[in-house]
């Protein structure tokens, strides 16, 4: 029975990436609406922008948690992950092949901090430009997590 994104298979805890995949799908849906003719109406565009930013924030938080969870699975002393800084976690994830570019995740963190502390339309528009690449990077992360946590037949 799943417990907080984990389930057992043999003696090893396996990550269940469903919540991250669903968050990513919500982000992609929001971005799709933002690119649609519906967004030609400024009021509707504002709502789609807000939905996209919110989906980004949620997906970002989950992506980082899943990086940490996977590293805990890989390290001989899982508690070491809790002592790592953000950049140590992201660099370790890159070294493990979970993400392709640690510096991009640092930029996503900065974008997340901007969106969580104040709402500024111009800043939100700048962040929107980065969201398709963010979605691609999270898709890569999910694929790597699913590869590592596939239950053997």
Question: Language-model features: where?
Answer:
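Solvent-exposed interaction patches of small proteins and small membrane subunits
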Residues: 2-153
């Amino acid at each position: 029975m799943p417990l907080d994104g984990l389930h057992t298979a043999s003696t090893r805890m396996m990550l269940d990436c469903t919540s991250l995949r669903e968050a990513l799908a919500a982000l992609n849906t929001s971005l799709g609406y933002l690119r649609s003719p519906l967004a030609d109406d400024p009021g509707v565009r504002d709502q789609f922008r807000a939905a996209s930013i919110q989906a980004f924030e949620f997906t970002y938080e989950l992506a980082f948690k899943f990086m940490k969870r996977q590293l805990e699975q890989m390290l001989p002393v899982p508690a070491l992950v809790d002592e790592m800084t953000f950049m140590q976690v992201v660099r370790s994830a890159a070294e493990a092949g979970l993400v392709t570019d640690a510096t991009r995740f640092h930029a996503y963190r900065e974008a997340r901090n901007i969106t969580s502390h104040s709402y500024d339309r111009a800043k939100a528009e700048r962040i929107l430009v980065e969201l398709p690449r963010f979605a691609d990077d999270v898709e890569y992360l999910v694929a790597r997590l699913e590869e590592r946590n596939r239950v053997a037949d």
